[in-house]
């Protein structure tokens, strides 16, 4: 019985890891320059020997200030220990915040950190191949004042 339970657990973990890496082609859609009304996100796939599976994505989030564009945060999405994590580092921050992927589909990626003050969730939703919606909120059941949504369109630089 113990062998059967161990085997079932092994298969379950293996299938979860496969399911996570199997979603990589959908995450690759994130690559590129996404422009919104008040800023943009620029995502680049990075090959890094320090990253498990060699999969990571680097982002610089820019906010528009009048006619100037200033970076305000660096983000990385990495595949590590059989799951995806989103690591956010605001420019003025002393340390990074890690969000774990809790849902990943062809069109939606949800990263959560219930212990973080705000946001507790970061959601990337592909509305089409050329349109991306980013939402940050205070977790499930957030009120309207605790939800921020940005829409971006893919543009070539």
Segments predicted by a language model, with ranges:
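Sec-dependent N-terminal signal peptides
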Residues: 4-13
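Sec/Tat signal peptide C-region and signal peptidase I cleavage site
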Residues: 15-19
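Edge beta-strand at a domain terminus
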Residues: 20, 101, 126, 131-157
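N-terminal helix-cap/turn-to-beta initiation motif at the start of protein domains
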Residues: 20-35
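Short beta-strand segments that buttress and anchor functional surface loops
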Residues: 34-36, 54-64, 86-90, 109-115, ...
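Short, solvent-exposed loop/hinge segments that bridge or flank secondary-structure elements
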Residues: 35-70, 76, 145
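Residue-level recognition of beta-strand termini and adjacent short loop/turns
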Residues: 47-48, 105, 128
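Contiguous, well-ordered beta-strand patches that form the walls/edges
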Residues: 68-116
């Amino acid at each position: 019985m113990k062998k059967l339970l161990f085997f079932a657990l092994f298969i379950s973990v293996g299938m979860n890891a496969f399911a996570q890496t199997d979603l990589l082609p959908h995450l690759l859609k994130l690559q590129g320059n996404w422009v919104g009304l008040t800023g943009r996100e620029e995502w680049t796939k990075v090959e890094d020997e320090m990253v498990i599976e060699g999969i990571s994505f680097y982002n610089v989030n820019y906010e528009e200030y009048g006619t100037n564009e200033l970076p305000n945060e660096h983000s990385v999405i990495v595949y590590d220990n059989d799951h995806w994590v989103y690591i956010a580092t605001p420019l003025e921050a002393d340390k990074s915040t890690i969000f774990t992927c809790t849902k990943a589909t062809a069109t939606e990626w949800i990263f959560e950190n219930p212990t973080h003050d705000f946001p507790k969730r970061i959601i990337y939703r592909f509305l089409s191949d050329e349109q991306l919606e980013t939402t940050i909120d205070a977790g499930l059941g957030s009120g309207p004042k605790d939800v921020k949504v940005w829409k971006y369109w893919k543009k070539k630089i």
